[in-house]
Amino acid sequence: MIKFAVIGVGTFGIKRATAIKNSNKAKLVAICDLNKDNVLKAQKILKVPFKSFDEILKDNEIEVVCICTPNKFHKTMIIDCLKSNKNVFCEKPLCRNLDEAKKIYEFS
């Protein structure tokens, strides 16, 4: 079973996290969001622990990080995840511009 963490559990993130939680081939092991209300709502629905982004990056159990944050954070988060040997699923758009996309490509 593939172990996931979801970063950003607002409108899209909660939907993505719910789909992962309901999959018989994946396990949702952590959620993360800077908005405390989003975290509390997601924990109530999903019954999954909160972890900070740094904790998720250091957690060897987590194989895939699903990034559902505002677009301005995508590039940095993707690269940080890749540096930590995490697989990444990122909501669209991948990033804000071609330069950011090139940096992600160059790192990967």
Where do the protein language model's features map onto the residues?
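N-terminal Rossmann-like dinucleotide-binding module
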Residues: 1-46
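A generic structural signal for well-ordered alpha-helical segments
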Residues: 42-43, 81, 108
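Beta-loop-alpha module in the N-terminal Rossmann-like domain of NAD(P)-dependent dehydrogenases
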Residues: 48-105
